[in-house]
Amino acid sequence: MATTKQNIEVERIQTGVRIEKRLLKVLKAVAELKDMTLGDLLEGIVLHAFEGKSAFSAASLKEIEQLKKLYGMTLQSSDSHHLKERR
């Protein structure tokens, strides 16, 4: 028997972050596919990561691979913390 989780009231704040251009394009496209805001998508990804879980199903990961190709995003997790901004 599935249980329905109650909505949890939170306080959100506006923040400005700098993020790699192609990565942002992919994230926005994923949010659009999932019919959610970019903020909701990012919260979900981070909360899953904090628990060592994947935020995406196998089907979603296939869609993300297609979006990465579409937007020319070649970065991988091993590239994190090694990105240098162009001047």
Regions found by a protein language model. Give the residues of each.
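Generic detector of low-complexity/intrinsically disordered segments
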Residues: 25-26, 43, 49, 63, ...
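Surface-exposed, Lys/Arg-rich phosphate-binding patches that contact polyanionic backbones
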Residues: 6-7, 13, 21-40, 44
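Short interaction-prone segments
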Residues: 55-73
